[in-house]
Regions:
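Mid-domain alpha/beta scaffold segments of enzyme catalytic cores
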Residues: 2-261
């Protein structure tokens, strides 16, 4: 399937990852050829900080940096990692606090600490007037408890790699101005999010890759890259029975407004 459009924004792209070291310029060329006009780059932890900033500095009109502590990086040194985020939040212009959230899939050993770290980073984002990028996996009710505890905080952001139900989508919108990141998973056979996406408003959707991971069909099993965001957009268009250009235009505008690009 050949899919090319005039404009797309990849709202979740780890372009600084070592997976792109050997062919970085070719990856960029393919992204631009595919109509990708910008990539939002979430942080993970302090280990990737310098690499992320190097890409952002090299591509100031294309790669937009974010800072945050990923839930799977919350371990015995979580206090030092969180202090790093706090110390560097005022260093430069960030476009979001993220990737932050809760992950109970790999381990629940540090879930209590994940919750503490998430709460503090949500408040940091609100105080800085920044959106959040939320990673949520097998900890949905814990996340809702966090949202309930922070009811007074003005919150906006992206539910990254959204794979929940329509009911969960509606429930999340009662707490915050969330957009919902749709990526390669939507192209997989029996992807559960497809039924929710049918009923979701396109005004609430952004597209993403999470590259180098979560590669869409027809390239599943290989390294993901920003140019492949077009396959997520194409699948959204198919599911919602809309022209691809309409999906591209709407999701791009949603991303621009959220991240103030």
């Amino acid at each position: 399937m050949c899919i090319f459009v005039d404009m797309l924004i990849d709202t979740h792209c780890h372009l600084y990852d070592e997976a792109f070291r050997d062919d970085f310029e070719a990856v960029l060329a393919r992204a631009r050829e595919a109509g990708v006009e910008a990539c939002v780059m979430p942080g993970i932890d302090r280990s990737c900080h310098d690499a992320l900033l190097a890409v952002a500095d090299a591509l100031p009109d294309f790669a937009f940096p974010c800072i945050g502590l990923h839930p799977t990086s919350v371990g015995t040194d979580w206090e030092e990692e969180l202090a790093f985020v706090k110390a560097h939040l005022a260093d430069q212009h960030w476009y979001a606090v993220g990737e932050i959230g809760l992950d109970g899939y790999w381990s629940k050993d540090f879930l209590k600490e994940q919750i503490r770290v998430l709460e503090e980073q949500i408040v940091l984002a609100a105080d800085a007037g920044l959106p959040v990028i939320i990673h949520l996996r097998e900890a949905t009710e814990d996340f809702f408890r966090v949202l309930e505890d922070l009811r007074g905080v003005v919150l906006r952001g992206v539910m990254h790699a959204y794979s929940g139900s329509y009911e969960t989508y509606r429930r999340l919108l009662t707490y915050a101005d969330f957009k919902f990141g749709i990526g390669g998973v939507v192209t997989y056979k029996n992807a559960g999010v497809a039924s929710a996406l049918e009923k979701m408003s396109l005004d609430d959707v952004v597209v993403e890759t999470d590259c180098p991971w979560l590669t869409p069909v027809p390239f599943r099993g290989r390294r993901n890259e920003p140019s492949y965001v077009r396959f997520a957009a194409g699948k959204i268009a198919q599911i919602k029975d809309l022209p691809l250009d309409s999906v591209a235009a709407a999701t791009t505008e949603n991303a621009r407004r959220l991240f103030k690009l």
